[in-house]
């Protein structure tokens, strides 16, 4: 009897997991949602993330699908949004102006840590918003149905 019960519970858990996976990245309104995690100070990663965002946006536009993209930076990845250290600032400005569905988020905890270490707040692009914590933001986005990737 216990074996049957365990098998049934495992089956239900698998069914729930499969159903959840099938809808990841898509909201109930049909909007496709993509979050991109940037936590390393690597120009190649910055460019890959921007390529993914623009390619996803192009694909969604071609099919007529509604979409939202959020690029979340924290730890060393915050350098992507720093006006004094980012090698991709021109691309960020261009994407922000041409693809309004792309949003950039900077981790407030990382900003506070850099401020303490450097003696002044790091200059963050005007195209980014500040969130309390990058990891918490990714968890919130996951709860909202975003598909999260790390290039």
Question: At which residue positions do the language-model features occur?
Answer:
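Secreted/extracellular ectodomain signature
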Residues: 23-151
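Bacterial N-terminal signal peptides
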Residues: 10-19
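N-terminal export leaders
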Residues: 3-9
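Bacterial/eukaryotic Sec-type N-terminal signal peptides
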Residues: 1-3, 16
């Amino acid at each position: 009897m216990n074996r049957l019960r365990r098998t049934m519970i495992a089956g239900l858990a698998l069914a729930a997991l499969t159903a959840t996976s099938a809808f990841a990245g898509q909201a109930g309104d049909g909007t496709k949602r993509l979050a991109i995690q940037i936590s390393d100070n690597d120009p190649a990663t910055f460019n890959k993330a921007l390529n993914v965002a623009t390619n996803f946006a192009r694909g969604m536009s071609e099919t007529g699908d509604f979409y939202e993209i959020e690029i979340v930076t924290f730890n060393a990845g915050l350098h992507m949004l720093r006006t004094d250290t980012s090698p991709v600032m021109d691309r960020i400005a261009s994407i922000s102006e041409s693809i309004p569905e792309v949003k950039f988020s900077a981790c407030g905890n990382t900003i506070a840590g850099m401020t303490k270490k450097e003696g002044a707040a790091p200059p963050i692009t005007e195209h980014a918003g500040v969130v309390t914590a990058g990891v918490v933001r990714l968890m919130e986005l996951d709860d909202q149905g975003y598909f999260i990737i790390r290039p």
